[in-house]
Amino acid sequence: MIQTQSMLDVADNSGARRVMCIKVLGGSHRRYAGIGDIIKVTVKEAIPRGKVKKGQVMTAVVVRTKHGVRRTDGSIIRFDGNAAVLLNSKQEPIGTRIFGPVTRELRTEKFMKIVSLAPEVL
């Protein structure tokens, strides 16, 4: 469950290392974002010569959460940390590689590119 002020790791090679959620998109008073939800983030930590710079406001999709996601069979998939993938204005990933596992819940029409780049799909 990601909310405003939540810090997330970046799971791609866009150049950002840590981002902070500044808005959960999808409703006027929506408080929490889960896996597969789109959020507005600001870059808090970035590497030199990356595609994004510190202080930039970006759109991102949540790919891993500590809270996890419940499957229809009753199992819960949880991760050790919260992570997101940065998106451009066309909702496509900025980076060309994805680090770490992602869940099957991202297998929608919008995020198939992220699933195909990921090394492992749970």
Swiss-Prot record:
GO terms for cellular component: cytosolic large ribosomal subunit. This is Large ribosomal subunit protein uL14. InterPro entries: Ribosomal_uL14 (IPR000218), Ribosomal_uL14_bac-type (IPR005745), Ribosomal_uL14_CS (IPR019972), Ribosomal_uL14_sf (IPR036853). It comes from Pseudomonas paraeruginosa (strain DSM 24068 / PA7). Binds to 23S rRNA. Forms part of two intersubunit bridges in the 70S ribosome. SUPFAM superfamilies: Ribosomal protein L14 (SSF50193). It comes from the Bacteria. Signal peptide: none annotated. PROSITE patterns: RIBOSOMAL_L14. GO terms for biological process: translation. GO terms for molecular function: large ribosomal subunit rRNA binding; structural constituent of ribosome. Keywords: Ribonucleoprotein, Ribosomal protein, RNA-binding, rRNA-binding. Part of the 50S ribosomal subunit. Forms a cluster with proteins L3 and L19. In the 70S ribosome, L14 and L19 interact and together make contacts with the 16S rRNA in bridges B5 and B8. Belongs to the universal ribosomal protein uL14 family. CDD domains: Ribosomal_uL14 (cd00337).
